[in-house]
Amino acid sequence: MKILLANPRGFCAGVYRAISIVESALKIYGPPIYVRHEVVHNRYVVEDLRKRGAIFIEHISQVPDGSVLIFSAHGVSQAVKAQAKARQLKILFDATCPLVTKVHMEVLRASRKGQEAILIGHAGHPEVEGTMGQYDNASAGVYLVESVEDVNQLKVKDENNLCFMTQTTLSVDDTLEITSALQKRFPKIIGPRKDDICYATTNRQQAVRELSEKSDMVLVVGSKNSSNSNRLAELAKRMGKPAYLIDSDADIHADWLKNIKYIGVTAGASAPDVLVQKVIITLQSLGADESIEMMGQEENIVFEIPKQLRIHATEISCS
């Protein structure tokens, strides 16, 4: 039984940046550091940061005056930003992924131009809530669609003044179907100049396609509330392979491995490599031998943390 490792897998640039912001803030300002929502959707990462002094909250009212506050990688609405600015905080850092911010700017532009905006995304996801919360033009409107059926039932005010954008962590295939439906129903609708689904989502889904072709079963390391991790497991199943979304190696069942020759392993963009390594060790204890790294798209994108954190971090390292 052999282990095939998808490439790329695991952390993306936005996740690295968000975690680094929390870690740097803890080092510079000391605990507690308040973070609105889980900084990334991974239980291991969140628990590790919580042990080090991060406090995860859902409402700005939960943050005491004089505190350090960080927005999560998923982004927040204009209303939440206004609430935070109205508080007597020591300092505020925004860990929103720059690629999510790109979509925010698209919605803001639509709002200012009086265009109706249609967001393709999953209801209730914090990224969607933050993105829709950029729109404040009461004379037009912003709408959420999750399926082709939603598109067919959608009612807008002006079919000639529409634009659309997407959540960054969607299924590439599903999104293509929905955008095609939008363009068919609203021929004059305008889409983003560059795809809103982020490079990491696209690359990891392509890697899972290739992994599924060579594997008898696929394990996706990622938490249940991770959108991009769920999409990877769904894609493997669409490829006709048994697929399991696991938080850690403790979730692996030995009976999954019966009659399996090749086990595919990948990880969502918010899952750290330490979890993948533990999965490999557990699989080897259950009879797997070598692990093989598959070829894949090289990623070299880096997003810098805020300048103030970089300066202070340098001062600490030099002292």
Curated annotation (Swiss-Prot):
UniProt-listed Pfam families: LYTB
Binding site for dimethylallyl diphosphate: H41, H74, H125, S226, S227, N228, S270
Active-site residues, record numbering mapped to chain: E127 (proton donor)
Ligand binding (isopentenyl diphosphate): H41, H74, H125, S226, S227, N228, S270
Keywords annotated in UniProt: 4Fe-4S, Iron, Iron-sulfur, Isoprene biosynthesis, Metal-binding, Oxidoreductase
Name recorded for this polypeptide: 4-hydroxy-3-methylbut-2-enyl diphosphate reductase
Family label: Belongs to the IspH family.
Binding-site positions, [4Fe-4S] cluster: C12, C97, C198
One GO BP annotation of this record: terpenoid biosynthetic process
Annotated gene: ispH
Annotated cofactor note: Binds 1 [4Fe-4S] cluster per subunit.
Gene3D superfamilies in alphabetical order: 3.40.50.11270, 4-hydroxy-3-methylbut-2-enyl diphosphate reductase, catalytic domain (3.40.1010.20)
Naturally occurring in which organism (per UniProt): Hamiltonella defensa subsp. Acyrthosiphon pisum (strain 5AT)
PANTHER family per record: 4-HYDROXY-3-METHYLBUT-2-ENYL DIPHOSPHATE REDUCTASE (PTHR30426:SF0)
List of residues binding (2E)-4-hydroxy-3-methylbut-2-enyl diphosphate: H41, H74, H125, T168, S226, S227, N228, S270
Gene Ontology MF, one: 4-hydroxy-3-methylbut-2-enyl diphosphate reductase activity
Function (record text): Catalyzes the conversion of 1-hydroxy-2-methyl-2-(E)-butenyl 4-diphosphate (HMBPP) into a mixture of isopentenyl diphosphate (IPP) and dimethylallyl diphosphate (DMAPP). Acts in the terminal step of the DOXP/MEP pathway for isoprenoid precursor biosynthesis.
UniProt cofactor(s): [4Fe-4S] cluster
EC number: 1.17.7.4
Reaction catalysis annotation: isopentenyl diphosphate + 2 oxidized [2Fe-2S]-[ferredoxin] + H2O = (2E)-4-hydroxy-3-methylbut-2-enyl diphosphate + 2 reduced [2Fe-2S]-[ferredoxin] + 2 H(+); dimethylallyl diphosphate + 2 oxidized [2Fe-2S]-[ferredoxin] + H2O = (2E)-4-hydroxy-3-methylbut-2-enyl diphosphate + 2 reduced [2Fe-2S]-[ferredoxin] + 2 H(+)
